[in-house]
Amino acid sequence: TRYGGVSVGGFSSLNLGDHVGDDSAIVARNRNILVERASLPAQPRWLVQVHGPVGVQADVNVAGGEADAAWAQSPNVVCAVLTADCLPVLLCDRGGKQVAVVHAGWRGLCSGVLDLTIDQFLGVDIPPTEILAWLGPAIGPAAYAVGSVVKDSFLAREPSCTNSFTQVRSGIWQFNLYASAR
């Protein structure tokens, strides 16, 4: 939610996004409020999200760069993404030694952001049964209508994604972001 911050107007009140036109000093105050109220051990590693397949190792890259995923293998490193309609995905290994967060919109999912993040962050030596994933709040299929460009892009990459699309009329489908992420 955005309750409890200091932003006003259309950004009211706990806006954490520095990319939407809110005053940067107010966004910084909101981010400090988040750290304090959530008892975070450090400021999150904020990213410049670009709806693509790139991720960064947050315990190595201190400054946020253009990426849609961040992971850490060190304690007290906070990974974060911002979402509205897009799907936030939280990942960790069963031992809790590695964590990741992914900003997964249709472009990122279609370009393989989840697969690439898992490969980079966990490596190929960890079996899939050792990975835990949580899918956060995102736009649901009843509210997400897409055209053939999105559908065709997904099916070209992953033909098994046909269950992510329900045709509502000629050239328009409801898109299930959750099903496509699974």
Predicted feature residues:
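Active-site microenvironment for binding and transforming phosphate-containing groups
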Residues: 1-182
